[in-house]
Amino acid sequence: MWILIYLFIIWSSLRTWVTAVDSTTTVGDDLNETVSASVWPTMSPQMTVAFRSQRDVMGNLTIDQLPYVGLNLRRVLLNNETSMVNEGNNTRLLTLFKSMLSSEANAFVLDLEQYNNDLRVVDTTLLFSDVLTALQSFIFSTQNNLYANIIVLLLNISAPELDSTEYRHQNQTLNTTYILDKNLGNSFIYKPTDLQSDRAKNNTWNIYGKSSIDGWPTLGSVLYEQKKRLVIGELTDFFNETTAPYIFPHDVFHYEQGNSTLDCPSTVEGLTDLSSIHWRFLDSLFNSVDIKEYISCGLSPIISNSAYVNNVTQLADIIHEGSVWSWDSDQPSVTQSTSKSGSSSGTLEAYNCVLLYYFANNETVTWRVGNCYNSNIGLCRYENMAFRWLVRSNKATYFDFDSYQGSKCPDQYSFNIPRSPLEQRSFIAYMRNSSFSDTQIWIDLNSISVSNCWVSGGPYASCPYEKVISRRNFVTMMVPASVCSFALLCIVVYLSVLRVPIYDNRKNWRRVINKISKSELEGVPS
């Protein structure tokens, strides 16, 4: 019995310790996880952290202003020049498509044609339902705060060669709602009715602020509150609101092919005017150099490089260059710790804060991890104005620049960060007009609470993915359990070693009992 109690005490102590250790696990532990298929090059742990941190920084941007990097599937994969298509290997095509979804690409142009009251991918034997099933599988596997992101699916519909009466009849009998419901599920789709509802609730914004007329919801609202993952739009004029209520019409999107008619803005006024245009896509040929320039000009590139048609994985480098518009090539490091350490000179080090490096000679910027205890100037933004910046000349550590005691930013300004390529472009314009030389500037991004979890909101912002227990809280939690376990263990040892007096004098006690028994009368009293 005592052995069982002792084992229970040990088990309870170990369980408490394991629970505490598990709760201190950082986001870095999931860096080796992947939802990618083996066909497409998987993102490295560093790339995963960089891409996720960008997504989180853009959480308060509206979904129509996000920088998307996309693929024209007919040009790069689903066409009759591709060996897999010629072989009729639909399984490999779908596997490759799913692995593309796991890459940094988050917009896709898909060419469809009507086929026996159904939709089929042009130049293949794939049905639209097959693509939707693969898309559903990917969404299910990434439906969490770590991996979730918005996907844009743009449809080019080829009309059948029929007269107007037959065309109108087939268009009306094609039930796209049924196809989407059966193979994908409408709960993941952000629909036109959802946009109407958000605008009615005043939950939409444009560049000037809240707008119930032409505003769109933020990325954070769509992903985390509404749990939506997919926006479907049509680039042709095949459907209408009645035949395809889940699909946004073509006039919602600014979609161009070849060369862009939009100028690359260099002033605040030009940036504001460009931001008033929703969903800016450019379908063209790109390389790893010019795609970054198009991204910085506020366009979302759709890659149509047919030269890679038989080795589509070569596009991974181009997609990578377009997707990461913020961090430097070797950043952020995923091996740093949030603990304070002292260097040989006796100074504190904590490489968990982000510096924006501005290079005046070529007017470029990049983000790098820096020591939070170093003194640098910081970046401030004016209220909710997306393109109005101020760099403070007084230097401070990251902890002192924006602390509980107050911010180094002046009134009506707040410690901030460029949240998009356009905002970063406006910052470059500010630095150029202010004649700054090469400069390192604190921005509102750090991983102080949890390693590899980069968050905004000052030095005391918490990681949304992980509950953090500090060493002090860990000791506070463990001490009572340890003391109680030790006390119970002492009692068990004491009772197992020492005998109670009645047990030690058992023979004497039996002699006394026998003597008393002899003096008792036997029989029944008369």
UniProtKB/Swiss-Prot annotation:
Keyword Cytoplasm belongs to the record: no
Query: Which Pfam families would you find in this protein's record?
Result: TIM-barrel_MTC6
Domain of life the protein comes from = Eukaryota
The residues exposed to the Cytoplasmic compartment are: 499-526
- Intervals, Extracellular compartment: 21-477
Which GO terms are recorded in the biological process aspect for this UniProt protein?
cellular response to hydrostatic pressure
Q: Would you indicate the residue range of the signal peptide?
A: 1-20
Q: How does it sit in the membrane?
A: Single-pass type I membrane protein
The subcellular location is: Membrane
Q: Which UniProt keywords apply?
A: Glycoprotein, Membrane, Signal, Transmembrane, Transmembrane helix
Q: What is this protein called?
A: Maintenance of telomere capping protein 6
Q: What does this protein do?
A: May be involved in telomere capping.
User: In which family does this protein belong, per the annotation?
Assistant: Belongs to the MTC6 family.
> Transmembrane helix: is it a keyword of this entry?
yes
